[in-house]
Amino acid sequence: MENGKRILIVDDDDEIRELLEFDIAQSGYFVDTASNGKDGLNKVLNNSYDLVILDVMMPKMNGFDVCKNIRQAKLSIPVLMLTAKGTIDDKTVGFDCGADDYLVKPFDVQEVLLRIRVLLRRNQPQAEPSLSNEILSAGNIEIFPDTLECVIVNKKIKLTPTEFEILYCLMQHFNNAVTLATLLDEVWGYDSDEDVRMLRVHVGGLRNKIEPDSKKPQYLHTVTNVGYKLTPFGE
C-alpha cells in the first residue's frame, strides 16, 4: 500500500463494511475488517493498526465496550465512531470511552476519508514534536504527553487523546481566551457547526475529570462568544 497505514473497520452491516473497505483501500490504505465487536477487539489486541473505525450497535460486543477495552489496554490508536446513534448522550458516552472522533450514519465517504487523514496526522509524533516529550506546566497544572495524563493538586488524571490535545492547546495560551476556531484547527485541523458541538462535548468530559465541580468550573472557563480559557484555580 502506498502510505502503509493499516485501518481496521468493525461493523456488522455487510454493505457498509464493504463500501468503506473499498473506498478506504482505493485511497491507499491497507484495510482489515471484522463483523462483530468481539472479533474486532481481538484483532486490535493481536495486530498493529494505525486507526480503528467502530460501529456501536454490534453483536457479541458493542462499539462503546470495544473502545473502552482498547483504552484499558493502554493503546493510543485513534478510534473513529461511525454509527447511527447520534444523540449528544451517545456521543458523550463514546468520547468518555476514549473515542477520538464521531460521525453519524448516513455519512459521506469523503467526510470519512477526511476524518481518517486528520486523525492519522494527529497521531504522528514527528508532526508535533512538542507533544511527544515536553512536560508542560502552568499554574498548578502539569501535563505529560508520553502518558496522556495531567496532574492537578497532586492528583493524577488520565485523559483521552482528544482531551489531552484540547488541554495542551489551552495550556499553551494559559490565562488567555482561545477561540473555538483555534481549538478546532489545532486539535482537528478543520471546523464546522458539527465539530463545534463535538468540541463542547469533549470540553464537558474534560471538565468532569479536572474540575472539583464541573457545573461550577474553576479551571476551564467558557468565554462567551469567543471560546475557552484555562486559568489558575478560582480565577
Where are the predicted features?
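Charged docking surfaces used in two-component/phosphorelay signaling
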Residues: 15-26
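Active-site beta3 strand of CheY-like receiver
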Residues: 48-53, 58
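Basic, amphipathic DNA-recognition helix from helix-turn-helix-like DNA-binding domains
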Residues: 60-62, 68-137
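Short, Lys/Arg-enriched segments at the junction into DNA-binding effector domains
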Residues: 5-6, 118-177, 181
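Short hydrophobic/Thr-rich beta-strand motif most characteristic of the beta2 strand and flanking loop
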Residues: 28-35, 43
